[in-house]
Amino acid sequence: MEKFIGKLFIEGEIVLLTGLHIGGSKESGEIGGLDNPVIKTVKGIPYIPGSSLKGKVRCLLERKYGFQPERNSGDPCGCGRCDICLLFGAHSADNKTVSRLIIRDSYLDEDHFIKEVLKGNIEDITYTEEKTENIIDRIKGTAQHPRIMERVPAGARFRFLSSISFYENDNIESLIKSFIEGLRLLEDEYLGGSGTRGYGHIRFD
């Protein structure tokens, strides 16, 4: 085990530029209920799981740098040497490395949401919006199979907390640069589901 030498904390906010959908469990099957609810805390407030952020950033970095997964496996890189493996952990059991990166769950800034998104309306506080989507019949030109999507509306802000641990022989500057690059790639992509339909455009502040 290499000697631990320090830790860098990277904090900020995640700002939703478009509605965000990260799926949660469907607790009830009532008629007219939501087909695709978002993940929420036990208090019913939406949040962004750290696992969703970490997995997406890793995927984008691997895509940019041309990592080729093993045929038919789709597994992430497991070399144990590159910045991606050092930050996120090597997938291969033969090259196990300590994951340097921690990304915490990101929780909603409720005060900002009520003031800026709900415009101070506290009589009926709801932290999500519903969007009906459907499929167009290519022959008839009519909408079919409508479904109700739940999402967190644009303008919401979530607290972003992360840290990178450093060990002897680490290229500290390179690890930091790679992580920040991953966050920038995410700003140019999308987080969560339905990104090709406009969901999940975010900005880090």
Language-model segments: residues:
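RNA-binding basic/glycine-rich loop and surface signature characteristic of RAMP-family CRISPR effectors
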Residues: 1-205
